[in-house]
């Protein structure tokens, strides 16, 4: 774990590119990472707890790489700290997104497959399936319960002028237990606040901001397919291109059910390194 934090400044200083992340935290659209580019992101989820619950802070790191124009792979490393309890490492995830069609269409499908090696203390809530995360049990109990899970998503996404609309249907299977399937959803829209550049070098100008809203939550399981008794949220989202290669994102998510936290706060910082794949290929090619 310490290796990644030591390596991060070196990677950030090596190369730059122009990129702006979409503002979603849970919903996926059809835009893939550029081939050969590496996107590094540090994000976190925290909440306003209900009575009897404890405040937590759940950070994670993402390493997203564009393998081809239609295939993006991503590694997540996560943990969490619960106030008055402890700090724990909660596991890792490896996701792959595949875009079947090369050209833009009215609706653009993306196939998503993720393997998760987590424990039950995970609270980043990158998605919500079933009834949602356990935020009441102590970490000492949750960290000893491992879960090897396989998650799939059908992503449908469309661009209309400067607007994006996306819908995700989520299915997750716990491979460690003889459980059924759990379901969830995410959907959202966003747009660029201005499509014409101001003509000035300005980071606070409207063209550097994307804003929208996303909706996400659980849909129960094969035992009880329902949106009731699950966590559900509506969340304004915004991203700000703070430099040619870095983006800040923020989102307050408001709980719609008693099983939801009253508010989930999410924030993230991403930095894209252009052409790292070809640079590494040339480096190792010269050593042969």
Q: Which residue stretches match the model-derived regions?
A:
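Bacterial N-terminal signal peptides
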Residues: 5-14
């Amino acid at each position: 774990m310490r290796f990644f934090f030591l390596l991060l400044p070196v990677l950030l200083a090596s190369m730059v590119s122009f990129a702006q992340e979409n503002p979603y935290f849970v919903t996926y659209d059809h835009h893939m990472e550029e081939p050969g580019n590496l996107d590094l992101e540090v994000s976190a989820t925290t909440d306003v707890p209900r009575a009897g619950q404890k405040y937590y802070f759940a950070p994670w790191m993402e390493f997203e790489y564009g393998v081809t124009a239609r295939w993006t792979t991503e590694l997540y490393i996560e943990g969490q700290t619960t106030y008055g309890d402890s700090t724990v490492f909660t596991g890792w995830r490896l996701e792959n997104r595949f875009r079947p069609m090369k050209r833009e269409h009215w609706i653009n499908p993306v196939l998503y497959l993720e393997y998760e090696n987590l424990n039950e203390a995970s609270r980043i809530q990158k998605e919500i399936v079933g009834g949602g995360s356990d935020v009441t049990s102590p970490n000492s109990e949750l960290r000893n319960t491992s879960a090897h899970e396989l998650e799939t998503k059908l992503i449908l996404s469309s661009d209309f002028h400067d607007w994006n609309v996306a819908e995700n249907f989520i299915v997750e299977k716990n491979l460690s237990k003889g459980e059924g399937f759990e379901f969830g959803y995410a959907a959202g829209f966003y747009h660029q606040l201005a499509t014409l550049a101001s003509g000035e070098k300005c980071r606070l100008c409207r063209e550097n901001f994307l804003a929208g809203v996303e909706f996400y939550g659980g849909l129960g399981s094969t035992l009880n397919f329902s949106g009731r008794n699950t966590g559900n949220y509506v969340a304004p989202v915004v991203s700000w291109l703070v430099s040619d290669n870095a983006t800040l994102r923020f989102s307050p998510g408001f709980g719609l059910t008693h099983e939801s936290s009253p508010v989930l706060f999410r924030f993230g910082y991403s930095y894209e390194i252009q052409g790292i794949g070809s640079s590494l290929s040339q480096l190792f090619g010269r050593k042969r």
